[in-house]
Amino acid sequence: MGRDTIAEIITSIRNADMDRKRVVRIASTNITENIVQILLREGFIENVRKHREKNKYFLVLTLRHRRNRKRPYRNILNLKRISRPGLRIYSNYQRIPRILGGMGIVILSTSRGIMTDREARLEGIGGEILCYIW
């Protein structure tokens, strides 16, 4: 049985965010690098750096936490895996769902690479819905 690297990075980021950790380390692959670049561009994480350890590459992510008056930290990341190896979910560009009325993002794998729902609508292409982030 194969590994689902997208589910692994989503779970790692979600667990680190709930545990109020500032830094999380994930395995580096082409897919994870593209997803992390989208998270960085959309402002969900602060910083990314590539780290090499014994011929393996890792991405070290710095998570963004917001201060709240009542509680010291507020969890800002909600990530949900949609298409998985056992059940692939595809959508054309007209039926890509809007998360929280456009406040969240949908990450898609298209024929032109991994992109957000806004980019896919602008280019007029659909693809496999990887995850929701809000």
Swiss-Prot record:
Transmembrane segments: none annotated. One of its GO terms (biological process) is translation. Keywords: Chloroplast, Plastid, Ribonucleoprotein, Ribosomal protein, RNA-binding, rRNA-binding. Pfam families: Ribosomal_S8. The keyword Ribonucleoprotein applies. One of its GO terms (molecular function) is rRNA binding. It comes from the Eukaryota. It is found in: Plastid, Chloroplast. One of its GO terms (cellular component) is chloroplast. The keyword Amino-acid biosynthesis does not apply. InterPro entries: Ribosomal_uS8 (IPR000630), Ribosomal_uS8_CS (IPR047863), Ribosomal_uS8_sf (IPR035987). HAMAP family: Ribosomal_uS8_B (MF_01302_B). One of the primary rRNA binding proteins, it binds directly to 16S rRNA central domain where it helps coordinate assembly of the platform of the 30S subunit. Part of the 30S ribosomal subunit. Belongs to the universal ribosomal protein uS8 family. This is Small ribosomal subunit protein uS8c. It comes from Nicotiana tabacum (Common tobacco). The gene is rps8.
